[in-house]
Design a protein with these regions (language model features):
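Extended hydrophobic/aromatic-rich secondary-structure runs
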Residues: 1-2, 109
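Sec-dependent N-terminal signal peptides
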Residues: 3-11
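Active-site-adjacent structural segments surrounding the nucleophilic cysteine of cysteine proteases
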Residues: 11-82, 87, 203-208, 215-223
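Conserved active-site-adjacent core of cysteine acyl-enzyme catalytic domains
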Residues: 19-38, 80-181, 186-190
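Low-complexity, Gly/Ser/Thr/Pro-rich intrinsically disordered linker/tail segments
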Residues: 175-223
Length: 223
């Protein structure tokens, strides 16, 4: 217990690099980057910074981490506000229509789907979903669903999350927004979420593979 108290009382503990060479001379000048728990939680996610910007952050997450666009939550939010009613946005947040109009302005194609369970499991590209989180409507990015029915979410407020299919269905409104455009990278960080832990990696529970999206390949086909 004493070491825990000492650790908690340290005035500044920051993530950085561990100079392994100082402790293991045989390794030479070798630095290993260290990622904090917070950094890992929000890896490859554009975080939301206002109560009403989860939609903008979700759009920015897909544009940046699936398509490689140099953008962020603020730029997307400013762009969507230019086409929306600011007062409505302050009270209710952005809508899927606001997101669709903004993405179409960028030259992306956007389509909404209402899906049943089996079709949902076949989604193979990151999409935007609307969830009910403790009574609040909240946009997040559905990254993938693996063969064990684990749902991988990139949540602008809560970070990278892995929940059960049942939990997802209980909070999801049944509609997702698919974004299709040039520059999609199937090897980008967003379409290939990391497992929560090494134990999941050992289980071979990697999400279903995702290829370059077009309307015919938003969903995987059964063999």
């Amino acid at each position: 217990m004493r070491w825990l108290l000492l650790l908690l009382c340290c005035p500044a503990v920051w993530a950085g690099s561990v100079p392994l060479g100082e402790h293991l001379p045989a390794l030479g000048d070798l630095n290993k980057p260290v990622q904090s728990i917070l950094e890992r939680r929000y890896a490859n996610i554009e975080r939301q910074h206002t109560d009403f910007s989860c939609g903008a952050a979700a759009v920015a997450t897909i544009l940046r981490y699936a398509y490689g666009h140099a953008t962020n939550e603020r730029w997307v939010m400013d762009g969507m506000l230019a086409m929306a009613d600011p007062e409505q946005v302050k009270h209710y947040g952005f809508s899927m229509l606001d997101m669709k109009q903004y993405l179409q302005m960028l030259g992306m194609r956007v389509r909404g789907y209402r899906l049943g369970d089996e079709k949902l499991r076949q989604v193979r590209v990151p999409t935007i979903v609307l969830l009910n989180i403790r009574g609040y409507q909240h946009f997040a990015v559905l990254r993938a669903i693996d063969r064990h029915d684990r749902v991988y979410l990139a949540d602008p407020a809560l970070g990278n999350r892995v929940i059960t299919f049942k939990e997802f269905k209980e909070s999801w409104n049944g509609i997702l927004l698919a974004v299709i455009g040039a520059g999609y990278r199937p090897d980008a960080p967003l379409p290939t979420p990391l497992p929560r832990s090494l134990s999941e990696a050992r289980m071979g529970s990697s999400p279903r593979s995702m290829k370059h999206p077009c309307w015919n390949s938003v969903f995987s086909t059964k063999s």
